[in-house]
Amino acid sequence: MEKIIIDTEQFQRTISRISHQIIEKHAILDNIILVGIKRRGAEIAEMLQKRISELAQISLPLMALDITFYRDDLNLTSKDPVYTGVEHQLNIEGKTVILIDDVLFTGRTIRAALDALLDFGRAKRIELVILVDRGHRELPIRADYVGKNIPTALNEQVQVRTEHYDGVSQVALIHSTNG
């Protein structure tokens, strides 16, 4: 069973609200880098970059981060995984990095992303943007900017859909009858 919990219009309003919050929090945007966790976090980062550019007339640097090599909760098929890293590596030394992902659940994806970012240098500060926080944390991770808090049961799944990958921007709550 599926329920749309954020429709396309709400999705765009959420991107706009988070963009406004980032601008309001940072008087100067010059030292900010947006880092989106592949796949949907990177697309959300692109949406934020575009909206911030429209609002503040500044194009923030953007980096897409692949954290597969850093994860501790996936079974890898090879003992020597291929690390693809980032599409465009930026110098994060002394910068404020705004890390962006679609769903915050256990916190393990964010922990892996933090490990990956540390390999690029020492950021002055790292802030976290999450489109949907569904609870059930296993690690002490908290987002600085949250699109929507949606408490879920463990047998539910939050599915963020984006234009690039799914042809529509929305969030669905999927209830599994198996568990």
UniProtKB/Swiss-Prot annotation:
SUPFAM superfamilies membership: PRTase-like (SSF53271)
Protein name: Bifunctional protein PyrR
Family: Belongs to the purine/pyrimidine phosphoribosyltransferase family. PyrR subfamily.
Entry superkingdom: Bacteria
Residues that bind substrate: 39-40, 101-109, 134, 158
Listed EC numbers: 2.4.2.9
Phylogenetic lineage: Bacteria, Pseudomonadati, Pseudomonadota, Gammaproteobacteria, Pasteurellales
GO MF terms, alphabetically ordered: uracil phosphoribosyltransferase activity
Locus of motif PRPP-binding: 97-109
First-level EC class: transferase
Catalytic function, reaction form: UMP + diphosphate = 5-phospho-alpha-D-ribose 1-diphosphate + uracil
UniProt function note: Regulates the transcription of the pyrimidine nucleotide (pyr) operon in response to exogenous pyrimidines. Also displays a weak uracil phosphoribosyltransferase activity which is not physiologically significant.
Encoding gene (name): pyrR
Swiss-Prot/TrEMBL keywords: Glycosyltransferase, Transcription, Transcription regulation, Transferase
GO biological process: regulation of DNA-templated transcription
Keyword Cell inner membrane found: no
InterPro entries given in the database record: PRibTrfase_dom, PRTase-like, PyrR, PyrR_bifunctional
